[in-house]
């Protein structure tokens, strides 16, 4: 058992979750973590035209405001995602808004896109030393009437420094945001953002990949609609998935009634089923990043086998500690050695059918 699981987690869990998160950011900014990474050509891959040193990324939500971009790569991650960032700064929803469900190794959040806004985050990113792939997760302000315009503004603002964009229309904590996943709205959104990218490509001379991040609570018909719009668009990939509104199977009855999106271990099955279904619907060429419930090498590898090209995690480091990316990569290399596999890409899609045939959880 790691030092974090023995002592560090106990100490941090004595604190309010937001306070603990702030302390983690301060620690990383102070350089308390040593520089470590796992370098092995078998972990390298190219996705959406981008070259990744490894397939394990830190999901949006941890470093919302680009405060510790360099330090995240010191933890072994192959890429990181900043945000969600909105055009104007906003404080988010009232506190308390972040809850640990320890029995379930889960988190409920209703943060509400609290962030410093485009201008400040852009300035911080410009000052960073680039150590790997950095994506920008863009969103809309809570009080915005034209939410699509907020996303287009995000693409224009960060275009010259983003390695990729994530269009976050699946957070359950901004009123009306998930409505953008409905087919007619999604069609308008994707067309507008494709046009925004074309304008920026003409200006800058290069194209930045765009990923769409979806909820795990969509019906089979809604997944079909997303797949069809993805095929019609020039978006580069999908991120599956955001947090869930479901509370199915939770043991922590005290906190399970809190409003917000649920992440962590209980999300693994639901998000992996959706991932595999979307891989079947989209075919082999469109990139997919798998997120939800990854806590070790086994769950990371299962996402790849279910159809993911890359994975992201966040809740996992809350419960397993900051060494999680390094641990996953080392153990994956052991699996590859045992299986005689030369590249992580070999595992992709091995269990798509197994996961895709399962019914979507209620």
UniProtKB/Swiss-Prot annotation:
Catalyzes the conversion of dihydroorotate to orotate with quinone as electron acceptor. Substrate binds at residues 64, 109-113, 168, 173, 242-243. GO terms for cellular component: cytoplasm; plasma membrane. Its main location: membrane. Monomer. PANTHER family: DIHYDROOROTATE DEHYDROGENASE (QUINONE), MITOCHONDRIAL, DIHYDROOROTATE DEHYDROGENASE (QUINONE), MITOCHONDRIAL-RELATED. One of its GO terms (molecular function) is dihydroorotate dehydrogenase (quinone) activity. Gene3D superfamilies: Aldolase class I (3.20.20.70). Belongs to the dihydroorotate dehydrogenase family. Type 2 subfamily. InterPro entries: Aldolase_TIM, DHO_dehydrogenase, Dihydroorotate_DH_2, Dihydroorotate_DH_cat, Dihydroorotate_DH_CS. Binds 1 FMN per subunit. Keywords: Cell membrane, Flavoprotein, FMN, Membrane, Oxidoreductase, Pyrimidine biosynthesis. FMN binds at residues 60-64, 84, 137, 168, 213, 241, 264, 293, 314-315. It is found in: Cell membrane. This is Dihydroorotate dehydrogenase (quinone). It holds the Pfam family DHO_dh. Its EC number is 1.3.5.2. The keyword Flavoprotein applies. It is a peripheral membrane protein. The lineage of its organism: Bacteria, Pseudomonadati, Pseudomonadota, Alphaproteobacteria, Hyphomicrobiales. Its cofactor is FMN. Pathway: Pyrimidine metabolism; UMP biosynthesis via de novo pathway; orotate from (S)-dihydroorotate (quinone route): step 1/1.
